């Protein structure tokens, strides 16, 4: 063999290498497939953005509507004949309502994120407005939106409650609440309810009537959940259990001592 032929043989392209190279390139072709995921994310974003815009518009409208509520009008509650400021009540009387209705009352600024989220979720799933409102929200609902039952009311309620918290201190808000809620038998203030049901007063500065007791405070705080159903003179098991629960919460949250709790439970007869 000629030297030149040997040179050509040694430098001849290797077919096996070409096939390996071809196989190598084919193996890496799937690398481009993740582009489908990007398309999927794009579709989700296209659907999500309009939804967020609609939600934003609804919230904006509800905020504008909430501005119609004049928070100065809440002061009208203080003009009731039997109005008593919360600062003039026993701590356990105030505690009976806070423990049962809004244990984080002194910590939040009008609404409790956990409670409100739970209430809105229940409203959406059950198609009915559920509880979970703070005392401030209940003040707003009772004064401005008493007959309105809807999700939009909940949203307006949040905005107004935040304004109320900025304009009034906690003592004033609690006073508005306890003096503008239905206790049954045509009683709408805690003082008139205490007079009517027990012949006592909630005003610690009033020397003309006996002071409301721990148990009586818990009974009134429990009754507002179903004022037309719960009968103080003939307490059902549900009503009794609710009062007991309130007393337990009052003790746990430091509004009453162990001895006060035990005495109240003994009076309750459970």
From Swiss-Prot:
Ranges annotated as biased composition (Polar residues): 11-24
Keyword Chaperone: no
Enzyme Commission number(s) from the entry: 2.4.99.28
Localisation per UniProt entry: Cell membrane
UniProt GO cellular component terms: outer membrane-bounded periplasmic space; plasma membrane
Gene3D superfamilies listed in its UniProt record: Biosynthetic peptidoglycan transglycosylase-like
Top-rank taxon, per record: Bacteria
Molecular function terms, GO-annotated: peptidoglycan glycosyltransferase activity
The keyword Transferase is assigned to this record: yes
GO biological process, one term: cell wall organization
Record-linked InterPro entries: Glyco_trans_51, Glycosyltr_51/Transpeptidase, Lysozyme-like_dom_sf, Monofunct_glyco_trans, PBP_transglycosylase
Gene that this sequence comes from: mgt
Organism per entry: Staphylococcus saprophyticus subsp. saprophyticus (strain ATCC 15305 / DSM 20229 / NCIMB 8711 / NCTC 7292 / S-41)
Protein name as it appears in the record: Monofunctional glycosyltransferase
Reaction it catalyzes: [GlcNAc-(1->4)-Mur2Ac(oyl-L-Ala-gamma-D-Glu-L-Lys-D-Ala-D-Ala)](n)-di-trans,octa-cis-undecaprenyl diphosphate + beta-D-GlcNAc-(1->4)-Mur2Ac(oyl-L-Ala-gamma-D-Glu-L-Lys-D-Ala-D-Ala)-di-trans,octa-cis-undecaprenyl diphosphate = [GlcNAc-(1->4)-Mur2Ac(oyl-L-Ala-gamma-D-Glu-L-Lys-D-Ala-D-Ala)](n+1)-di-trans,octa-cis-undecaprenyl diphosphate + di-trans,octa-cis-undecaprenyl diphosphate + H(+)
Pathway entry: Cell wall biogenesis; peptidoglycan biosynthesis
Principal location class: membrane
Region annotation (Disordered) ranges: 1-35
Recorded family membership: Belongs to the glycosyltransferase 51 family.
Its membrane topology: Single-pass membrane protein
Keywords for this protein: Cell membrane, Cell shape, Cell wall biogenesis/degradation, Glycosyltransferase, Membrane, Peptidoglycan synthesis, Transferase, Transmembrane, Transmembrane helix
């Amino acid at each position: 063999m000629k030297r030149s032929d040997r040179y050509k043989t040694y430098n001849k392209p290797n077919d096996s290498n070409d096939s390996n190279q071809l196989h190598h390139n084919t193996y890496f072709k799937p690398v481009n497939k993740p582009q489908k995921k990007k398309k999927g994310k794009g579709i989700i974003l296209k659907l999500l953005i309009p939804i967020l815009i609609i939600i934003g518009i609804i919230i904006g409208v509800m905020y504008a509507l909430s501005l119609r509520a004049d928070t100065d009008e809440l002061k009208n509650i203080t003009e009731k004949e039997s109005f008593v400021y919360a600062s003039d009540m026993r701590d356990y009387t105030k505690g009976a309502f806070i423990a049962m209705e809004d244990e984080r009352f002194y910590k939040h600024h009008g609404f409790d994120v956990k409670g409100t989220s739970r209430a809105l979720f229940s409203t959406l799933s059950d198609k009915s407005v559920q509880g979970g409102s703070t005392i401030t929200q209940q003040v707003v609902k009772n004064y401005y939106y008493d007959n309105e039952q809807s999700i939009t009311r909940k949203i307006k309620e949040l905005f107004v409650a935040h304004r109320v918290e900025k304009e009034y201190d906690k003592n004033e808000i609690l006073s508005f609440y306890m003096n503008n809620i239905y206790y049954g038998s045509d009683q709408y203030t805690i003082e008139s309810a205490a007079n009517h049901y027990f012949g006592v007063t909630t005003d610690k500065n009033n020397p003309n009537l006996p002071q409301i007791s721990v148990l009586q405070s818990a009974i009134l705080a429990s009754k507002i959940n179903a004022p037309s159903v719960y009968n103080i003179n003939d307490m059902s098991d549900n009503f009794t259990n609710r009062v007991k629960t309130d007393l337990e919460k009052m003790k746990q949250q430091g509004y009453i001592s162990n001895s006060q709790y035990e005495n109240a439970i003994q009076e309750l007869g459970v």
